[in-house]
Amino acid sequence: MTDAPIVRVAQGALQGRVANAPSGKAYYSFQGIPYAKPPLGSLRFKAPQPPEPWEDVRDATAEGNVSAQVDHMANKQYIGDENCLFLNVYTPSIEGSSLPVMVFIHGGGFSFGSGNTDMYGPAYLVEKDVVVVTVNYRLGPLGFLSLHTPAVPGNAGLKDMAQALRWLRDNVHSFGGDPANLTVFGESAGGVATSLLTASPLTRNLISKAIIQSGTALNSWAFQNDPLHNARQLARSLGCDAEDVEGILEFLSTTPVKDLVEAASQTTEEDFIQRGAITFAPVVEREFPGVEAALSESFLDVLTSGRVAQVPVMIGSTALEFTQERRAEELQEYLPGALGLARGSAEAAAAAQRLQQLYLSGEERLGRAQLLSDVLINVDTHRYVQYLLKATNQPIYYYKFDYVGELNLSKKLYPNLEEELKQALHADELSYLFRMELLQDVEPTMQDIKIRERMVRLWTNFAKVGNPTPDENHYLTVRWQPVSGEDLHCLRLASELALITSPDADRMDFWDDLYSKHFKIWNLPEQTTLPSTIEIVSYVQHSSGSIVEETTETLVQTTVQETQQLEITTPEPEVIPEPVPELPSVPEPVPVGQSVVDAPLNGVKESQVNGNHDKKPRTSNEIKMVQNSNGNPKDVIRANDPPEDDLPKNIGVNKFVNFFESLGGKK
């Protein structure tokens, strides 16, 4: 193994270095690789551009800049640079290999963090003969400012990730990787991003497998509440009084990056306290001619219609994600806004009473932490698994990380937690997958080492063959069964492995019942059959809202059995609630051939529609439909809605506790 390895990519030659894992096994490290043109000057807030070539051999022995940010892990100091679009590649072999590739998307609320080795050392994974890639992407307003204009449609950070995947498709073979066997995995905001990448038309065909850890795009905090308000608020905090988007863009485009990021961080903190929302996060983009959109319709629409990557998925969360309590005393404040339950209504009061019984009948501190964890992560993970089960015929492996050892990150960060809260918390599984500098002084027990080896094998086996337990051995003593329509199998990752069914069933049954009554969705088909070609008509809108152009796009998918048409009419309808597995109180839904989503928006501002300002709040939260004798939807109306009103493209936005204070366990 040469000490100064050189590889050639499309832009030129790269010289890396040899690194050593704790076991002594050597691997190649290539760091600070530019996967896009520096997003400086006129490229601020814009989609990434392909990287420029270089002539000499480029030094790839040190990490590149992290995104400009206020570092919440280091006394809230400003760090990083606007020129941050770099990735790192770690590989056991560069000659004649075609190894599985694992691309990690870091978390941090789309506001802080990086893919660097201080938190995400690759050694444990690389030892298992996979190529590991970590990515830096733009954060905060640099990555997620949206003005709903062609110039700044939003989601620049997501498009950074898409550009990184495109670059890897074209170049990872130079590092011994197989571009046709690429797994994307991420935690927290990285989990949200991973689920979005499986749904984005920019990336869903580049992904072979996905691992989604403690966060999905169904989470309310995954989307901005009001992008234009956020942009105006940021500009105003910096001294700009412009209300029009052109004036705001001109001002923010020339503001020094340090001032921009620090002001955004302050605005973000105020938003957390007042609204429990992430200020700069993904949005549902408006469509413009010649402008690529990472996501132009609600994630839920894409998911339930089966237009996500048809790939194996691993998904799960930790036993107790968060330890922070909701500031509000009223339990009704925990109820997701997507349910459309008006505060003070009889329905909301009844639901709050049930929350009291489920979560607060025992130790209140633990109960409130569990309630927050469910509302922020677990309920939507549970819902995502059930939606995905209908949207794909690929295996879904569900897990719950429930191990507390010396390597748990929370032990280092929050040593004074109450005893009942010392469970596996948000991000605790990461230190059993990555080597972290923060834990270098921690002496792991033999059990910790065994758990780490077990976790690494599960994750890398899945990346290799799409099955985390292809063989049983000393470490993998249980054959992990994927979720099925009959059983919600889940692997409990504790001191010992255990295959359980329907984790947290009592609590999830309550939420299933609540969603089935108040969140309306057509029943999904028993098995999704995608058409061989789907014609999608997109309308290009003038700023006034009038349609000025109509285009048709063809997407290639799988075979189709028959074509179905929906007609707007007014016969006597039948209400179809959201399907819930094995709940006797909920009537058995009738299968239909095509899924359409409607989210209740009673009392919700137009600005609270996951960034989609094209939609107005509806006067009713019901979808009504009539079925043919063959079970297919025939005629569709919505109660109290005009016939010409198109199908919804959004889901409601919840309002919850300060996400980062929850992560930190502060009171």
Predicted regions and their residues:
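A structural signal for well-ordered alpha-helical segments within the folded catalytic domains
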Residues: 28, 81-85, 159-162, 166, ...
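Short amphipathic alpha-helical interaction elements and helix-loop-helix interfaces
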Residues: 93, 131, 174, 178, ...
